[in-house]
């Protein structure tokens, strides 16, 4: 039978407004309809096929698409809705059957409707000329008809030519169920309600920038795109005091060759005051590294990704922009905001969290689905599509790649065997014209550098081009080396090198090597390479010793491959045999010690291989430059990336608030305790399995920051693997501590341990005692408590003497970075004449000024002449002669803003002393010659020859070449600012470096005492003495004091000291 569908003879329509997932919808109520209807693009839910004939005044129509609206806060059970654009003003139509099931009550007195025990306001609207619909429901369902499903989507634009008949048939049936996910150009774009973008700024003062002037053609384009965004509901008119200018950037021409443009908003000033969102963006290498052993890949393309996220209401006004026609603001998240990528990544992780790393991986709006079989892959696609549909997101299905054996993802081609460069970008490189300008060189190197991991010895090949980027360097495109470098890079990209994807079940091998000018490394498994890396050494690194360069290669390579190596046992292969004893070096030096500490977070073994067997890494580190290689441009590795791996720390777990301790035993038991305010969970287990580890993580990893201790590396690998698989289901940051100390329960027990150890070890001092205790025990504020206990020790107070510094401590002299930064002066005497000798440390430029006497006035006048000729230095270093030590000369130098630094007694400065030896040698040579004219101008001839004629051994240049054409540090204000900023850290670094040398054979004196005086002895009257020790006063009778003086060598004149 045919039933009339909802025609209101009064010409008025009754509807209610419901809120579902944060969005309001208009629901038309029709007691005469036996079905429910919903407009297209309201919800992205899987479509079922159920035919229904509808008769209208214009003729019959057929409805085929049915969605099942899931149970929610409004509808208490799943309800069917036919998909059809039945109205332009309403979103849904609720029929009689649903109204009856909901036990609806319409109260016209109060204009309310009760639906499922919830009351809504009844709204009446005027007629909108809807069609008069008559429906006839057919009982049969055709949901199982695959032939019907094939007709639902236009697959002519889909990329399915690579599929066989079975794959095509199954895929089309699956895609048709999710037809509502497809976005077509011109449709109204939906948005997700899982997240809103919030603009947190440092202040609320409006940011206003004037509109940029645009060409007339661009103004027309801007207005057209603004109108389109208004129609789609992406923007609205604004009254905001904020304003950011619009500009136009060109896009690729369309198929007809017509120019295309994109309107963008310049949010740079807004971004400057935006507080950065530290949500981690995944590392591309890390994502690509998880795609091994897969046979099928599907890449998903979200439609206008950022625009599918709603703006927070309070942040909308900050996105305001203006055009010639008006002032607008974004309702959806626009492109160009500082934190937009982080918000989008957070959104995608929240939506797909249960599927990440198991079925799919996400990088911003790029989603890749991976599986090992067809059935598994189709199931993975359905799971991902269901999550996206629940989040109300739209896809550009015609741009997606389905069931591919080779997928284009993040600029690479992912295959079951490995990763290959993208052929599209390879084609762009091949057709690239030879660069003739700096900007073109940088663009080309940026394009090829994107694939540098596939090119062994990239730094060597690109060197002739990178060297052209130096200042004042002419680009010679006819130069053979330049052309060869350019063509070779293109030829190497044309090749199809395939790198193996990492298998995290196997052991990694990191092979490194360093040459005089570059570093190289290769990461491999079972002899198959995973990635090649190389870079040149900078000017500072060129002066490193052989072992320093080899260790630098290891430090740099482990940092680059951190996400592969951290938390895993791996092997380092090097042809530098001394590195095998890296951990056993007693005095490695400050630089090696810092690098050794940096490598301590890794678990590795160093193996020696012969140089000829290390051909790959050796080739990567060889850079063949015939001359002037010291100042060549340097290629640097990428910054350290974020990682999902459990990080390691050498700090004992006892110092952390949330502790989880794994103990292997014959029991399976969990205990909770608390000590010193720290929460401790002790998990006893017999055998660790992956399933057990996952359950432990889900049950106990519930806090924001957790530190774990697990002794067995094998069991830790299992926990690590479990954490990687479920890391995106929690917000927990996990650190593994390598040490577990014994907690001392009470102060009495703590004091007993200290006193017993202190006596047993013959009364060590505070620092030694603290270190000994902390090796095996933990007690809060132990250092301060140990200090108090030892301060009260009578034996220490009476027996230990003072250690006074007798000489200045040895310090490493920092190298100057400019000419005129540091002068070294001394008094030089020869043949009855006296001179002030001066040498610039940076350039080795030397000069002498004659003086009549050695008093400070003559020295000042000589220094004035030197400063007039050479310029004033920042630092003047001199011996402790009477003239240089005079207070008058020091004050004059302070007025001239020159810092004076005096050497210790009997400790000459090597540079100027060597200059004196050279001058004496030259004088003896001149005196032995017969040239009388030269004898009359000995000093002038010697200085001219020294500065202008001879290259210095240290610099490799003539001193005058460096000194006369170098800049002046006083005028370089930016560097002065940078040095002031670094001053605090500089002092600390110098102190740390000095500690390695203060115990060495060159340190003749004792160290300066950083502590305050601790003991003072004075005679109060003829019969009594008073000893003050750390504010504790003890009185002695003279006979008792003399006895202690004899036994402990105390004296009244004794100065304060430490133990």
From Swiss-Prot:
One BP term from GO: proteolysis
Gene Ontology molecular function terms on file: aspartic-type endopeptidase activity; endonuclease activity; nucleic acid binding; RNA-directed DNA polymerase activity
Domain Reverse transcriptase: 230-414
Domain Integrase catalytic stretches: 812-967
Name of a matching Pfam family: Integrase_H2C2
Region spans: Disordered: 998-1059
Compositional bias ranges of the Polar residues kind: 1050-1059
Entry superkingdom: Eukaryota
The enzyme's E.C. designation: 3.4.23.-, 2.7.7.49
Catalysed conversion reaction: DNA(n) + a 2'-deoxyribonucleoside 5'-triphosphate = DNA(n+1) + diphosphate
Enzyme active site: 30
A single GO cellular-component term on record: DNA polymerase complex
Keyword Membrane: no
Record PANTHER family: PROTEIN CBG26694, PROTEIN NYNRIN-LIKE
Name of this protein: Retrovirus-related Pol polyprotein from transposon 297
Species this chain originates from: Drosophila melanogaster (Fruit fly)
Source species taxonomy: Eukaryota, Metazoa, Ecdysozoa, Arthropoda, Hexapoda
Gene that this polypeptide is encoded by: pol
